[in-house]
Amino acid sequence: MKHKVKRIHFVGIGGAGMSGIAEVLANLGFMVSGSDLGENAATRRLAALGVQVRVGHAAENVAGADAVVISTAVRNDNPEVVAARSRHVPIVPRAQMLAELMRLKHGIAIAGTHGKTTTTSLVASILAEGGMDPTFVIGGKLNAAGANARLGKGDFLVAEADESDASFLLLTPVISVITNIDADHMDTYGHDFARLKQAFVDFLQHLPFYGVAVLCEDDPHVRSIMPLVSKQVVRYGLSESANIRAENVRAEGGRMLFDVVRTNGSVSRLPIELNLPGVHNVLNALAAIAVATEVQVPDAAIIKALAEFRGVGRRFQRYGEVALRDAEGTPQGSCTLIDDYGHHPVEMAATLAAARGAFPGRRLVLAFQPHRYTRTRDCFEDFVKVLSTVDALLLAEVYAAGEAPVVAADGRSLARAIRVAGKVEPVFVEDIDEMPATVLAAVRDGDVVITMGAGSIGAVPGKLASSEELV
């Protein structure tokens, strides 16, 4: 039956989750096409691989397609979806297509509210270093590979498992990781945290009888579901009760050094030098080490992969030093520029703590764009708290991501609440296009500047770090 499917069309092909699956399918030999509202690095990469990419959505784009893949961001009234439905062309959710790919391999699925992309990238890097040539589909660009997806010849497929729309319940991996569980995407679960936790339990129950659940012992919500899991469980974390734990954790020049103690009948120790900052990344690395241990990657490969890990796009991505000049063009020193995808208060706090550890004593300037009005509303007080910890704050208007505005959950309301809290004086930037100039006007020599958010602020660091401004 599968041989009947020759051409697969993606609506919104430039998205992080969609482009990776499209690339793997193209490399498997399928004719792949897609459309998006604009070009980006992902669409250009796909076009170079021979994928037909069109800018704009139109009914004629799906002509000749045997299947149409959509993400949850695509509306039912999209002209391509309407055309596919009228022609009785199967409309396939993105997660279902990922599940089909996972059936061809031994799946390793990384779930959790925070840390999925980094952990997935670490697992893929370790397996690659161990000679296992994995297939991977990641939500961000793996810098060492220059892409967010790759078709490998090995037995394993490593992918993120997305809980935001409960689509991770479609996956059938042999190893499942849960990094943490936090209150996010609560609309999907009727604003019921118990339902969210149950979804993670159900995700683990999809493991086969020989499968393994790799769970973070340090996260209280993950720990609370462990008694409900009827599969083999490997616990990782800093806790003494973890099967795979880190000891002697210390920060050194933007890297984390620690010893891994593995307890599984016998005890073994592994010295690790992780080329990422922050204790949260130590936990991500422990999850990856747990997976690598299960699939018997040699210790030498684990050590080498973590020491040489080159990071993931928009996850504490370092752009280097940006030259500062006054109005007359006179050099005024430089600032360090970092970009991060963080958009939930918990992950933002972890990133800011990592920055403090990597650059002790330096002034921290944050340019932040909130993502979604509903998240801003639901996490309002937590946003006020975490945003008040920086030395200077440039706050953009909320990136709607298709949502209608919510009263008292916009950027101005957030800026007002932060101002009332009294720890930092925010500068509100209504137009994101004005953010680069606002940043350059606010920074001083020696500052560390972090651009952060999941929306259009992702274009800001590139404008700041243009070739003539880098030193």
From Swiss-Prot:
Pathway the protein takes part in = Cell wall biogenesis; peptidoglycan biosynthesis
Q: Where in the cell is it found?
A: Cytoplasm
What EC number(s) does the entry state? 6.3.2.8
Query: What catalytic activity is recorded?
Result: UDP-N-acetyl-alpha-D-muramate + L-alanine + ATP = UDP-N-acetyl-alpha-D-muramoyl-L-alanine + ADP + phosphate + H(+)
Q: Which UniProt keywords apply?
A: ATP-binding, Cell cycle, Cell division, Cell shape, Cell wall biogenesis/degradation, Cytoplasm, Ligase, Nucleotide-binding, Peptidoglycan synthesis
GO BP, sorted A to Z? cell division; cell wall organization; peptidoglycan biosynthetic process; regulation of cell shape
The molecular function terms in GO held by this entry are: ATP binding; UDP-N-acetylmuramate-L-alanine ligase activity
Query: What are the record's GO terms for cellular component?
Result: cytoplasm
Query: What superkingdom heads the lineage?
Result: Bacteria
List positions binding ATP: G112, T113, H114, G115, K116, T117, T118
The keyword Cell cycle is assigned to this record: yes
The UniProt family comment states: Belongs to the MurCDEF family.
User: What does the UniProt function comment say about this protein?
Assistant: Cell wall formation.
Q: Which PANTHER family match?
A: UDP-N-ACETYLMURAMATE--L-ALANINE LIGASE, UDP-N-ACETYLMURAMATE--L-ALANINE LIGASE-RELATED
Q: What is this protein called?
A: UDP-N-acetylmuramate--L-alanine ligase
Q: Which organism is it from?
A: Aromatoleum aromaticum (strain DSM 19018 / LMG 30748 / EbN1)
